[in-house]
Amino acid sequence: WEHIRGIEPYEISHPPLGKLIMGVGIRLFGMTPFGWRFMGTLFGVGMLPLLYVFLKNLFGRTSIATCGTVLLAADFMHLTQTRLATIDTYAFFFILLMYYFMYRYLTLPAGAPFRKCALPLFLSGLFWGIGAASKWTVIYGCTGLVVLYFIGLYQKLRDWPADGETGARQPGRLKWAFQILAFSVLVFALIPAAIYTLSYLPYAWAEGDSSLTGLVGAMWENQKYMLSYHSGVTDTHPYSSRWYQWLFDIRPILYYMDNSVPGYTTRFAAFVNPVVCWGGLLAVLACAVQAVRRRCARALFIVIGYLAQLVPWFFIGRITFAYHYFPSVLFLILALCYVFYSLSEQEELIAWKPAMYAVTAGAAALYALFYPVLVGIQIPSWYGTCLLRWLPSWPF
């Protein structure tokens, strides 16, 4: 709202681009619940076809891509967070895109011309820059991109086609490596830095100094504030949780509760669909085993992405919540689909499609069961205590 009005913003604990995106809905529909939630919901819907395309590229099977997309659509966190006016939706969206285009680059054959490699690298870097300017958690994902990038670079140079007569590596390899490295500095460092800095133009305009010096100064001052703010949060919260609790859905965050009507309750919470959370964790472990034993590139890709989003939280001492696990849901679903794909390779021994459809249907059934507490619909108190309180720490 402040950015739209051209005044200094009150809430400055995150980079501004996510709120600028949110402001598009407010400009279109006014300062109303529909207006401030519109863009988040739109991005939430947009994730689904993007994930489908990603899964189709990863595994090449329509049935797996469809079931993986349904798993995201049926995830509790996906519904809850994309309906709220929060920036977590944009972080997830851009993480999805930056990993998709990195995968497209990694799967290009060794010896592919620079021009063919440039586009997926550019798009991966572009969406990483946009994501980082929306929320810092996207920066965690960039660590995974860096690891994957250098693994891919090593493999492409190692497998570079040899000359048919001499058996020596073609001389174009060094030229290609120089071009790729120089281009990567541009698309993963310089362009994202420019996007990040330019996202602070509303700050500079509000302060009356839109010069380059004023823009950089406004950006830098906010970085210092954000670092101080996030490292200095010491307050407690009854629905906070630590990273090791996220792995098992131990503590949902309760956004709203109303017990004013006797015998009825209204709850509104964010947590991961148990099928995705628990099944996905087992699937990530399976991917880790396959990455080590079979040196499976797909499995390694998924494990690196998952760890890049999770491991930084090991070292963060400030109060945290279940929604911080939201970006990891992407890799839980990728891991589940990897397991489906692995089973499909043994279809003469295992009826993999019924198993995949059963898992997907189970997630959809839980989505229907828990729907009232994902959107804040009033329910009889017995419904929560008898059907929804699976763990003592679940606030239903």
Regions inferred by a protein language model and the residue ranges of each:
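Short acidic/glycine- and proline-prone juxtamembrane loop motifs at membrane-interface regions
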Residues: 40, 77-90, 134-137
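Membrane-interface transmembrane helices that cradle and orient dolichyl/undecaprenyl
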Residues: 59, 98-121, 150-160
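Transmembrane helical bundles and short interhelical boundary loops of multi-pass, membrane-embedded
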Residues: 116, 147, 153-157, 161-188, ...
